[in-house]
Structures are given as C-alpha cells and as structure tokens.
C-alpha cells in the first residue's frame, strides 16, 4: 500500500504578502517544515480583500511572491509542489469579479472567508450567484462563525 499524499490547501506562506511568512527565509523555513511533515503539495492562499486592493493588483503581487517562493524552493531543494489560490474575504461584489483569478489554480473552487461575528447581508444570494456561475465556494474556518454553526441550514438556502 502506498503512502498517502498530504496536501495543504490553505496556507499563508508566500513571502511578505499577508499575515503569513514575513519574507523569503520564513517561506523556506515553513515549507521545509511542511515537507518534513509529509506534505507534498501546497495551495498558497493569501488573503484577498476586495475593499482594500483591486483584483489585478492582488494577482500581480501574488504572482511575484509565488515566483520568489518557487525559486527559493528550487534553490534549497525543497520538493513541495505549489500552486496559488486565495482566501477571499466575503463581499457582495464577489459575483461580479473575475473569480478565475481567485480560485485554486486550474479549478473552479474558491476559498471564501466569512465575517466572524456578523451574519453578512446577502450571503445566501451571493453564494448562490457564485454557484450559478459554475464556481464552488469552500468556506474557510467555518467553525469560527456562530451564525453558521448554530444554523447550518443557512448554507443550504
């Protein structure tokens, strides 16, 4: 029987792009730990806040940080495959964005982070619109949202 392949689908390891790795050295250290723990692939998911940064600027910054991370892994002999996605903070504007730039690379899966304590207006309509466009929202940190854990049916409306 072959060993299972571990994949980290939600990490903040790109250098200097959000609250994860502060620089290239931190990225290398964290990816070495991932590799030592048996992780063979990662999906870099830096935070995207529509209200703070335009989508194109975000995509360019992520691409630059990704390039630095990949080159560092090659230089250091780290054998962890890496792709990009994003952890997208909920906004009612989501259905109007080019979501392909935010999805897990090569997929239609989009990682969405909801506000922690406030049930956002329009959540049902926004998630439904995303689904109608052919994308599948994946909720990050669902355990943090009392309005979801207390009423899971909310997500099925």
Write out the residue ranges for each language-model feature.
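An N-terminally biased module of ancient metal coordination in phosphate/nucleic-acid-related enzymes
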Residues: 1-78, 156
């Amino acid at each position: 029987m072959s060993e299972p392949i571990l994949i980290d689908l939600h990490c903040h390891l790109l250098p200097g792009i959000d609250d994860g790795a502060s620089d290239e050295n931190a990225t290398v250290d964290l990816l070495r730990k991932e590799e030592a723990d048996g992780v063979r692939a990662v999906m870099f998911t830096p935070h995207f806040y529509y209200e703070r940064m335009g989508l194109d600027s975000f995509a360019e910054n992520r691409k630059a940080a990704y390039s630095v991370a990949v080159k560092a892994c090659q230089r250091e002999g780290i054998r962890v495959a890496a792709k990009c996605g994003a952890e997208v903070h909920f906004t009612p504007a989501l259905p109007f964005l080019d979501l392909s730039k935010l999805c897990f690379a090569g997929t239609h899966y989009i990682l969405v982070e909801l506000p922690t304590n406030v049930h956002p207006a329009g959540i049902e309509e926004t998630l439904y619109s995303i689904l109608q466009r052919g994308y599948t929202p994946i909720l990050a940190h669902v355990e943090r949202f009392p309005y979801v854990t207390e009423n899971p049916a909310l997500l099925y409306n």
